[in-house]
Amino acid sequence: LLATDALTRLRLRPVARVGCLALFLAAVVAALATGYFDDLSIMREYRVNAATFGREVQRHLWLAFGSLFAAVAVGLPLGLLCHREPRLRAGVLGALNFVQTVPSIALFGLLMAPLAALAVAVPWLGEHGVSGIGAAPAVVALFVYALLPIVANTVVGLSQVSPATVDAATGMGFTAGQRLRQVKLPLALPTILTGIRIVLVQNIGLVTIAALIGGGGLGAFVFQGIGQT
């Protein structure tokens, strides 16, 4: 993070910035490979818990990316619908904004009872891992949190497309579907990708809290360390 921030402040060109960052990462990897950091306590701790660490990293990434993909699959169509229906937009964005005000640990806790009841009512879901604790409430909470940036950025991106551009496409004989696929979405894509990037950063941080409800991830090490102090 420090290296990335420093490169940004230097105002280098994109190619030079990527090259400098690659050199920095190569130096860190070389130092790790040669054992330069082996005497540090964090490296000793890693060697003792290497298998557990690898498993929790995989679970952390699965929770973060799994909820992201689900949010993209739902958020993009919902954003398109909100763009077309202004009255629906106000209600949907208002509800998603309200969800963002709920603390993550509180939302994780609120989902435990409904999901536990759902697993009892529908045994098939319980057999496939849905329960009041574990990954299920974590994925649902992360999914709900992820919807606002994706839906909002989709609406903003589509709204920023120039009406003159859309009119030109109409004059060329484009249908409504063609205007959406070939004109509006490509022009709105940078804004939509910004929303997805925000969600990914947000999810990676929030997954840490999931360890409190048995969701696993790197948060398990965080709370283990807190418990030992």
Task: Locate predicted features.
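Alpha-helical membrane-interface segments at transmembrane helix boundaries
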Residues: 54-62, 96-100, 189, 193, ...
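Cytoplasmic-entry segments and transmembrane alpha-helices of multi-pass inner-membrane transporters
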Residues: 20, 78-114, 142, 147-159, ...
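Transmembrane alpha-helices
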Residues: 176-210
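N-terminal, non-cleaved signal-anchor transmembrane helix
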Residues: 1-62
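Interhelical loop and adjacent transmembrane-helix boundary motif
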Residues: 215-229
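Membrane-interfacial helix termini and adjacent extracytoplasmic/periplasmic loops
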Residues: 40, 108-149
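Transmembrane alpha-helix signature in integral membrane proteins
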Residues: 53-81, 196
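Intracellular coupling helices
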Residues: 158-170, 178-182
